[in-house]
Amino acid sequence: MASKKGDPEELYVRQEKIGKGSFGEVFKGINKKTNETIAIKTIDLEDAEDEIEDIQQEINVLSQCESPFVTKYFGSFLKGSKLWIIMEYLAGGSVLDLMKPGPFDEGYIAIILRELLKGLEYLHSEGKIHRDIKAANVLLSASGDVKLADFGVSGQLTDQMTKRNTFVGTPFWMAPEVIKQTGYDSKADIWSMGITALEMAKGEPPRADLHPMRALFLIPKDPPPTLEGNFSKGFKEFCALCLNKDPNQRPTAKDLLKHKFIKAAKKTSSLTDLIERRQKWLQLNGNNADDENDDLDRDAKSNEEDFGWEFPTIKQKSPVAVQEQQQTPQKPTVVSTPIKEQQQQQQPTPVTTPQQPVTTTTTTPTTETKVRSLSNSSQTTPVKTTVAATTAPATTPASNAPTSTTPNGAAVTQQQAPRASALTSVIYPVLSKLLKNTSDENVINALAQLKMAFDNAEKAKPGITHSLIAQIIETLKR
């Protein structure tokens, strides 16, 4: 997506900060020409070098969406290393903001879910998956219109790719198949919407009292959460349909719009009651009450720091990039290379390392180079190749890969089974963080040996890392 030239401050007046979105801060603003109120997301690309691909993904998705149920995108501007993304201003705030005074009555929940389903029906019909549905990413206008926001981790499904394998989302809202990396499709959004329904009814998602890492182990293992309490049979049934652990048994957004609980929902104008409720709550508690650290996402982020996780939203490269290897890890280096569209993308070149771990220096493009890639046409996408606590990918001849057929008859090459998510999503990030924070050669060598030990153990007995971490968590609980 091309960014516009010129100084955005000549076109817009940036006013007070109104929140934080994926990658940056969000301000209220005014279009000088039309006097229209808009939202301005500002991102310092020098501070977000590793997220440039994801930022461009959000811009690409927003620019392609034309729906009354998705936040409008008006354009983006580069000023030095600062990126301005101009979007529709939604004065009602997020559903999470509106929940600060307390959970919602189910009548309001039904309205929000209906509008959310309309947004998902549109996205899914366009072959897109949101992948981060939660109350914080659902916004309201002053008149009660409901819109989906925050597309930083959205995915695109094509005829040649019926299921994705990337590990993304926010832990408490993640579908079991996403965590297990068995491949997923738009039904993952339906699960997350079911969790969001429970969040609105109870004030927080299931397992919110647990560390996010423990939640990741329990979600695929335990029975699905249910809506308990004084709620209607229709609402409980709706949640149960969304939270079926078998994605093939979950209804589509289109089907759920026909559910009796949704069909009985009132007009969106009723949601202005929630906006007024929050305004009264702010008057009683002071405007600073909105800034308190009671956001579950922020709590999760502070809890995870000891484990080397990056919450609230996780995005991991496709498991294909972490296939079995026999090579020695290096000090982490991130290389960002602009390449043509994904159909021209080649497998990363395997990295040859010496027998003993050493610290290597790799010339990396500057932030300025990455920033320029955002200004180019949509034919160029910056892609990150990470040489970190992962090893180089093994190349598998396409001719040996099993194939299947999509419903429309297109041949699909199935990806090899991904490595254990515990190894690629827990051990590697922790080792990478430890490696980044030390210059002691003894520590570096020890970490390299530790990683090799995990690699060898996982190769000898797939899933052993998951079992080990699960046992550690059980021990710590005692």
From Swiss-Prot:
GO: which molecular function terms? actin binding; ATP binding; metal ion binding; protein kinase activity; protein serine kinase activity; protein serine/threonine kinase activity
**What PROSITE patterns does the record point to?**
PROTEIN_KINASE_ATP (PS00107), PROTEIN_KINASE_DOM (PS50011)
Q: Which residues bind ATP?
A: 18-26, 41
Record SUPFAM superfamilies: Protein kinase-like (PK-like)
According to the entry, every stretch annotated as the Protein kinase domain falls at 12-262
**Recorded superkingdom:** Eukaryota
Q: Give residue spans, biased composition: Low complexity.
A: 341-368, 380-408
Q: Which InterPro entries match?
A: Kinase-like_dom_sf, PDC10_dimerisation_sf, PDCD10_N, Prot_kinase_dom, Protein_kinase_ATP_BS, STE20/SPS1-PAK
**Activity versus pH, per record:** Optimum pH is 7.5.
Q: Which GO terms describe its cellular component?
A: actin cytoskeleton; centrosome; cleavage furrow; cytoplasm; cytosol; mitotic spindle; nucleus
Modes of activity regulation: Phosphorylation of severin is reduced with high concentrations of calcium ions.
So what EC number does this one have?
Answer: 2.7.11.1
| Composition bias type Polar residues, residue spans | 323-340
- Catalysed reaction(s)? L-seryl-[protein] + ATP = O-phospho-L-seryl-[protein] + ADP + H(+); L-threonyl-[protein] + ATP = O-phospho-L-threonyl-[protein] + ADP + H(+)
Q: Where is this region: Disordered?
A: 306-410
**Which cofactors does it use?**
Mg(2+); Mn(2+)
GO terms for biological process, alphabetical: cell division; hippo signaling; hyperosmotic response; intracellular signal transduction; positive regulation of cell division; positive regulation of mitotic cytokinetic process; protein phosphorylation; regulation of actin cytoskeleton organization
* List of catalytic residues: 132
Main location as per UniProt: cytoplasm
Localization, per the record, is: Cytoplasm, Cytosol; Nucleus; Cytoplasm, Cytoskeleton, Microtubule organizing center, Centrosome; Cytoplasm, Cytoskeleton, Spindle
Pfam families annotated for this entry? PDCD10_N, Pkinase
Which keywords does this chain's UniProt record carry?
A: Actin-binding, ATP-binding, Cell cycle, Cell division, Cytoplasm, Cytoskeleton, Kinase, Magnesium, Manganese, Metal-binding, Nucleotide-binding, Nucleus, Phosphoprotein, Serine/threonine-protein kinase, Transferase
Relate the protein's function as given in its record. Answer: Involved in regulation of actin cytoskeleton organization during cell motility; F-actin fragmenting and capping protein allowing dynamic rearrangements of the actin cytoskeleton. Also part of a regulatory pathway from the centrosome to the midzone, thus regulating the completion of cell division.
- Please state what the protein is called: Serine/threonine-protein kinase svkA
